[in-house]
UniProtKB/Swiss-Prot annotation:
Protein name: Proteases secretion protein PrtE
GO biological process, alphabetically ordered: protein secretion; transmembrane transport
Compartment annotation: Cell inner membrane
Membrane topology of the entry: Single-pass membrane protein
Family the entry assigns: Belongs to the membrane fusion protein (MFP) (TC 8.A.1) family.
UniProt organism field: Dickeya chrysanthemi (Pectobacterium chrysanthemi)
Residue ranges annotated as Periplasmic topological domain: 51-448
Role according to the record: Involved in the secretion of proteases A, B, C and G.
PROSITE patterns: HLYD_FAMILY (PS00543)
Transmembrane segments: 31-50
Record Gene3D superfamilies: 2.40.50.100
Domain of life from the UniProt record: Bacteria
Gene responsible for this protein: prtE
Keywords carried by this UniProt record: Cell inner membrane, Cell membrane, Membrane, Transmembrane, Transmembrane helix, Transport
């Protein structure tokens, strides 16, 4: 093979290689374009059909259901013992601190003694009013009889009841004895009066017979005159006796009236005293209830289970003013809530019941899952931030039980920052890109 043949063969091989490379490059270019078109088509298909969550971003903070419980005392007083400190977990009803009880106990016992005296007096006056021989069995006295200290009080009032009733009885019996004497005198006077009336009638008949005879001188005139004198004397005695009978009857009526008046005065006195005692008793009952309430509340107790925070009382023997805040309790085992804010222009997109995804930014974002929750409250009117004057609408989100479990025991404290996303629906990526443009279309080409 000559040198020229070798050169020609090499050129042919080189041309074939260039042709093969050109075809490979064209094939790769076509494949690349097909891949680009397929990717773009797939992207368009995804952008048109794939659902994306739409919603409103929320910034908020963790709060406790019912908020922190402020511990105060209505009356105040002197601190006897402090039984908790900041950070202590307390049960509902646990004693937090105890106030000095001397003043409250003294007041309660004094009012209790007054109460015992008054209910015994009330029972005695009711017995006098009803003319009973023993104290009236009022519900208050029946209940109080069980206490040993009531025995002496009841005995004193029973003695007073008997004494007053006996005094009244003796007074009335004395008047009745006078009436009996007057009635005896009245009986005697009535007999005398009857005798005088008979004697007067006899003398009258004698005069009727003597006057005609004396006129005809059949009998001496002196006998007629003597009979007339006797008649006049008897008539005078009869009139006198009749007057005494009338006076005696009036005396009897006056004595009976005296008894009625004395009984009326006694009843009036009893009723007046009973009214005063019952009014005082009602007042003492009211004061005693207040005193017993104060005594029962010398021990300040936790209203709910939770953690003691923000202690303000540290000195045993110190003085607490009425209504002074002593500490707060953050409730535990309460629903986990988040107070958030949304811009005012987003208020029409959020309502109660919408699902929310929450992220607690205080924890590691790589290990802490998004926590599900639900919008439970949206403020009825817009609010304004006191610091910068920014308007907003407030909403409250409750973390679901599933969301609590997903935290795997992480301690959530009030005040922790939270980022949230309120899911209001779904939309495509194309809708997301073109919605702002579509929202402005009605304003396009209308400006002067």
């Amino acid at each position: 093979m000559t040198g020229m043949d070798i050169t020609t063969q090499d050129e042919l091989n080189e041309a074939a290689m260039r042709d093969r490379a050109s075809r490979d490059e064209e094939r790769a270019l076509r494949l690349g374009w097909w891949l680009v078109l397929a990717g773009f088509g797939g992207f368009l298909l995804w952008a048109l059909l794939a659902p994306l969550d739409k919603g409103v971003a929320v910034q908020g903070n963790v709060v406790v259901s019912g908020n922190r419980k402020v511990i105060q005392h209505m009356q105040g007083g002197i601190v006897d013992r402090i039984q908790v400190k900041d950070g202590d977990r307390v049960a509902a009803g646990q004693v937090l601190l105890t106030l000095n009880a001397v003043d409250a106990r003294t007041t309660s016992e004094g009012l209790g003694s007054q109460y015992d005296q008054l209910i015994a007096r009330e029972a005695r006056l009711l017995a006098e009013q009803r003319n009973q021989s023993s104290l009236a069995a009022t519900p208050r006295l029946t209940q109080a009889r069980q206490r040993p200290e009531m025995a002496a009080i009841i005995a004193l009032q029973e003695d007073l009841l008997r004494s007053r009733q006996q005094s009244l009885k003796l007074e009335i019996d004395g008047v009745r004895a006078s009436i009996d004497g007057l009635e005896t005198s009245l009986g005697a006077l009535q007999k005398v009066m009857s005798s005088k009336q008979s004697e007067q009638a006899t003398l009258s008949q004698q005069l009727q017979g003597l006057r005609p005879l004396a006129a005809d001188n059949y009998v001496p005139r002196n006998k007629m005159l003597e009979t007339e004198r006797l008649f006049a004397q008897v008539s005078g005695e009869l009139a006198q006796t009749s007057g005494e009978v009338g006076r005696t009857r009036r005396d009897i009526q006056q004595q009976k009236l005296r008894i009625a008046q004395r009984q009326q005065e006694y009843d009036k006195e009893v009723n007046s005293e009973l009214s005063d005692v019952q009014a005082k008793l009602n007042e003492v009952i009211s004061q005693r209830e207040k005193a017993d309430f104060n005594l029962a509340n010398v021990q300040v107790r936790a209203p709910v289970a939770g953690t003691v925070v923000d202690m303000k009382i540290f000195t045993e023997g110190g003085v607490i003013a009425p209504g002074q805040v002593m500490m707060d309790i953050v409730p535990e085992d309460q629903p986990l809530l988040v107070d958030g804010r949304i811009p005012v222009e987003m208020v029409d997109k959020v309502w109660s019941g919408l699902p929310v995804e929450l992220q607690f930014t205080a924890f590691s974002q790589s290990t802490t899952p998004r926590v599900p929750g639900t919008v439970t409250l949206l403020s009825a009117d817009r609010l304004v931030d006191e610091k910068d004057g920014t308007p907003y609408y407030g909403l409250r989100i409750q973390v679901s039980e599933e969301g609590k479990r997903s935290l795997h025991g992480l301690e959530i404290k009030p005040g922790m920052p939270v980022q949230g996303f309120v899911r209001t629906g779904e939309r495509s990526f194309i809708n997301y890109l073109f919605k702002p443009l579509m929202d402005r279309m009605h304003l396009a080409l209308t400006e002067e």
